[in-house]
Amino acid sequence: MYFAEPVAKLIEHLAKLPGIGPKTAQKLALYLLEIPEEEARALAEAIITARKNTRYCSICFNLTDTDPCAICRNPGRNHRLLMVVEEAKDVAAMERTGSFNGIYHVLHGVLSPIKGIGPEDLKVRELLLRLSREPVEEIIIATNPTVEGEATAMYLASLLKPLNFKVTRIAHGLPVGSDIEYADELTIRKALEGRRVLE
């Protein structure tokens, strides 16, 4: 199907978004062209504002508009309990459950030798530095139940256990090969409750 160049360019950019294929990009582009101009401007402004005003927390590396983030600076959180997650979206998924009152550390990925991602490409060094300064007692490793997620969990456990931390792994109420982000609140809560000590 032929589209004018500006529309084709919009479709091309939308198709670069995760989970958006060419047909969905086309559908979204046509929808965006149909909405009132003020709605389109508001969407564009929201994207620009989010890009401009969002940064990574200097403590946990979660997305935030303040530094440190609201979770890290909250004295009501249990700062002795730290959950390590792959991505910022995993923090959002955990927070949705309302069942975790500790703090987080976002790795920004997982180990993947095939993709050339090693520990130096993740926030592992920052995690170790943080643990030397904070009163953390238990570390919950909440990487996704994928091959890379498991490898990352085992690597972290091998680093952290000699440092005398209690290191646990969330239970696998989560289906193997899936992402935490897509799990419902009950599944995440059960996985959190059933965490186990990593040997």
UniProtKB/Swiss-Prot annotation:
Q: Which GO terms describe its molecular function?
A: DNA binding; zinc ion binding
Task: Kindly list the organism's lineage.
Answer: Bacteria, Bacillati, Bacillota, Clostridia, Thermoanaerobacterales
What are the entry keywords? DNA damage, DNA recombination, DNA repair, Metal-binding, Zinc, Zinc-finger
Which parts of this protein are zinc fingers (C4-type)? 57-72
* Any Gene Ontology biological process: DNA recombination
Name of the molecule in the record: Recombination protein RecR
Q: Report if keyword Transmembrane is assigned.
A: no
Gene3D superfamilies xref list = 3.30.60.80, 3.40.1360.10, 6.10.250.240, RecR Domain 1 (1.10.8.420)
A Pfam family: RecR_C
The entry sums up its family as follows: Belongs to the RecR family.
State its role: May play a role in DNA repair. It seems to be involved in an RecBC-independent recombinational process of DNA repair. It may act with RecF and RecO.
Q: Which stretches make up the Toprim domain?
A: 80-175
> Its encoding gene is what?
recR
Q: Name the InterPro entries on file.
A: DNA_Rcmb_RecR, Hlx-hairpin-Hlx_DNA-bd_motif, Rcmb_RecR, Rcmb_RecR_Znf, TOPRIM_dom, TOPRIM_RecR
